[in-house]
């Protein structure tokens, strides 16, 4: 054996002892025209003659070729090798401790994120309920103000004829005063004009009869028009209230909470301005209406006075002086009635001004309450923004910890491969030199670490095949192999409403081979974004539209197909996943070295990387 080793050293092609291990990676993708594989496979092949263990083999060969002195130095070489492996084991143990610490830290951060997310959901729900209550109260207050405004409009319309009559009565009073003076002068010529007055009286009788009939019909029409106007006003107010309520309800269902508050505030200001403007116009027009009503009343009284005057001319011409005196008395009574009408007008005006002032105070109070609510909304929005920033920082920290953990995990994988190679090389050399390997110290830590470095005699190779198709913009981008989630992706530049759509999963997983899920009616997938539907057994927080937690579970098998259908039952997307497993019992080669180390890396789109050495 010594001669053989010396020959190898003295040959023309000595072995290269300073080269590092090399690896080759291959990736395989199997899919249809619209599908892509979500799992990548990386194979790492370790070559024995190019490992750092070559240095150890060269040192052992040099000792053997030196004759008896080389044989005497073999225990020292083995001792050095043992010390080197102890050093490697200690380093690897430190890596394992670091990974465990990182895992514990990640678990703590995940619990913190779940706590913050649950608190945020509860607080958002409370804020939403509080806002809904305030909006309902404001809507009821607005309905009450609208009803009061309708009542004021009806009262204004009812007082308008009285005001017109008062104005007409005032003008007629002036006319009657002038006619009274003319009548005193005309009494002297009454006898000469008696015949003409009698003829005119007959004409006046006919004209008065026609005017009386026309006046009755006009009064009936006015009453009917007043009733119709009152009904139309009530219907218009109710229709406006219903229309406003429907608009607010639609705005609330759209979920645009901040825009709704701004719109509501602007609407309140506009309504306040309109109410003030309408009340000012009503106040100006109410006086005109009351004067018109007064004028109509005076005109009716004037007609009655003219009838009395003509009858007096016909019946008692000789008592014309007494009739003139009676006209004076009636004029005084009309003056008294006019004064009373003016007092009533002033009282109505005062009452209207008082009502207008009360409405203005009520509007100011509502505006102050609305401003207070705006301040509260701003405070809550600021608090929500702070919470979201804190949650974002926590997510960033968690991502950083996961990246650090992944780096440590990659180093651990390479160290596992190197340690396995070193162990196999050492065992081969010890068998070739007929050397007995000394036992390792039987401590709990060494036993535990030894189990992690043990290379299995066999392994199972799992292969996944995915096929996907879609007829629209929504695609089924991923199916989790463990049945934790199904991901939908919107590949268009516009938002797509998927409310009422249905997901159906069919697998060969025993009797319960079907799982269906109906999407909520308000669900929308934003442009170039995705929505993930999680099983109920995961620890994911329900945060639509990005993450939705269903009540059931996804049941996957060796062959699983998922279809997405619209509310009408039209299939728009499909994805099928097939997994196959093969077992290889010849993991170690004839020399005791591993044939290859396989690294299976899951797709990074789900923010989880599962690395397995087989």
Swiss-Prot record:
Residues 1-51, 433-454 are annotated as: Disordered. GO terms for cellular component: intermediate filament; nuclear inner membrane; nuclear lamina. Residues 77-117 are annotated as: Coil 1A. Residues 21-37 have a biased composition (Low complexity). It is a lipid-anchor. Residues 118-128 are annotated as: Linker 1. A motif (Nuclear localization signal) lies at residues 449-458. Residues 462-581 form the LTD domain. Keywords: Coiled coil, Intermediate filament, Lipoprotein, Membrane, Nucleus, Prenylation. Residues 81-433 form the IF rod domain. Residues 427-611 are annotated as: Tail. It is found in: Nucleus inner membrane. Residues 269-286 are annotated as: Linker 2. A lipid is attached at residue 611 (S-farnesyl cysteine). Residues 612-614 form a propeptide. Residues 1-10 have a biased composition (Basic residues). Residues 1-76 are annotated as: Head. One of its GO terms (molecular function) is structural constituent of cytoskeleton. PROSITE patterns: IF_ROD_2, LTD. Belongs to the intermediate filament family. Contains an alpha-helical IF rod domain organization with three coiled coil-forming segments (coil 1A, coil 1B, and coil 2). Intermediate filament (IF) protein, component of the nuclear lamina, a fibrous layer on the nucleoplasmic side of the inner nuclear membrane, which is thought to provide a framework for the nuclear envelope. This is Lamin-2.
